[in-house]
Amino acid sequence: MSKLKTRKSAAKRFKATATGKFMRRRAFHNHLLDHKSSKLKRHLSTKAVVDERDADNVKLMIPYA
């Protein structure tokens, strides 16, 4: 059987944890940040866990993570 290909776009966006979960960046932290509070920007700069409903799709895109 041939090797499974990794979707490079997904590999750049998601990182696997030691327990098999996937981490992702939060949205709304690229531009138009002037009117957002420091607390919100600090929160948006942290990583978030991919929801369990989406984790199966991420796992298919990154088979060797």
UniProtKB/Swiss-Prot annotation:
Q: Which SUPFAM superfamilies match?
A: L35p-like
Cite a single Pfam family from the UniProt record: Ribosomal_L35p
A GO cellular-component term linked to this record: cytosolic large ribosomal subunit
Question: Single Gene Ontology BP term?
Answer: translation
What Gene3D superfamilies does the annotation carry? 4.10.410.60
GO MF terms here are: structural constituent of ribosome
Q: Which UniProt keywords apply?
A: Ribonucleoprotein, Ribosomal protein
Q: Check the record and name the NCBIfam families matching this protein.
A: rpmI_bact (TIGR00001)
Family classification:
Belongs to the bacterial ribosomal protein bL35 family.
Recorded protein name is: Large ribosomal subunit protein bL35
